[in-house]
């Protein structure tokens, strides 16, 4: 079944409306969740910080501390320091907090900023299981277009094309005994600003890991066809099989083709390398 598809910025916009309507304290900073698919076992929660009028805040200089608790276990409070990740360097970014979601249900997320400005707590629904393929799952073997099967201009909306990302089909990569990194992104049709930066980062990192399979999966098919629209009907088969609710995503698989990690939205410096070095 094809799922609804939403980008990081679209989710932030929807959350901003909901949060703004929930409080009349216009002086408070609000946090907007950017993680689309939080689930039990995740320790990677992304959020933006905004002023109530929508002005984007956040930088490495504005330190943020998070307190998180499940509403059905309010006596257990997790306090973590969030780190700031640039989405578009020098322009837009998100905070990442390693919250140990250990139960499903509604969680209250409170946060404080080093500027001392008042903030507004918010709620997050944590699912028992993620919507996407999860760590520990056998990665779906899905054929994806390669340079051997498809004209370069029909492979990707990332230009100029980085040919090493299109030498292997994803199903071939998962069965050749090497680690695999699958990047699901669509630079030309991204509903967030994150696809292009993620592609640039992974291309740079891949040069240091020649023994790893690197496969870019364009989110949509037929993007050069007349009448094309970036909608659910044009989702690539691999996007459907991996049950992606948004873009971009990275999935890291071990030598046996088992999912080791999933990374949503924005990539921290050294985050992917740490997974590949283990």
Can you describe what each PLM-predicted range is?
Residues 116-172:
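N-terminal "domain-start" segment that seeds a small globular fold
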Residues 17-20:
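C-terminal motif of bacterial Sec signal peptides marking the signal peptidase cleavage site
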Residues 22-24:
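Bacterial signal peptide processing site
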Residues 162, 170-191:
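Short active-site neighborhood of thiol/selenol oxidoreductases, capturing the structured segment around
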Residues 81-113:
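Ligand-binding face of N-terminal immunoglobulin V-set domains in extracellular IgSF glycoproteins
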Residues 192-208:
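Typically the conserved alpha-helix immediately C-terminal to a functionally engaged Cys/Sec
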Residues 217-247, 252-259, 269, 275-278:
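Thioredoxin-like thiol-disulfide oxidoreductase module
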Residues 42-55, 64:
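Beta-strand-rich structural segments
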């Amino acid at each position: 079944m094809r799922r609804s598809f939403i980008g990081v910025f679209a989710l932030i916009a929807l959350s901003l409306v909901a949060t703004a309507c929930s409080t009349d304290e216009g002086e408070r900073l609000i946090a907007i969740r950017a993680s689309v698919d939080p689930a039990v076992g995740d320790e990677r929660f992304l959020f933006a910080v905004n002023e109530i009028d929508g002005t984007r805040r956040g930088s490495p200089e504005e330190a943020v501390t998070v307190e998180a608790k499940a509403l059905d276990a309010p006596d257990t409070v997790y306090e973590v320091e969030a780190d700031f990740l640039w989405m578009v360097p020098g322009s837009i970014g998100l905070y990442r907090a390693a919250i140990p979601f250990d139960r499903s249900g509604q969680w209250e997320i409170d946060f404080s900023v080093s500027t001392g400005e008042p903030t507004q707590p918010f709620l997050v629904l944590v699912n028992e299981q993620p919507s996407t393929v999860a760590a520990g799952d056998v990665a779906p073997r899905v054929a994806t277009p390669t340079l051997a099967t498809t004209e370069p201009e029909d492979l990707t909306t990332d230009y100029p094309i980085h040919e090493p990302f299109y030498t292997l089909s994803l199903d071939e990569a998962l069965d050749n005994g090497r680690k695999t990194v699958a990047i699901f992104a669509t630079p030309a049709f991204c509903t967030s600003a994150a696809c292009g930066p993620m592609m640039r980062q992974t291309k740079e990192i891949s040069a240091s890991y020649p023994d790893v399979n690197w496969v870019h999966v364009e989110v949509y098919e037929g993007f050069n066809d007349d009448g094309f629209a970036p909608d659910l009907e044009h989702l690539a088969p691999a996007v459907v099989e991996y049950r992606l609710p948004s873009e971009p995503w990275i999935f890291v698989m071990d030598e046996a083709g088992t999912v080791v990690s999933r990374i949503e939205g924005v990539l921290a410096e050294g985050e992917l390398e740490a997974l590949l070095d283990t």
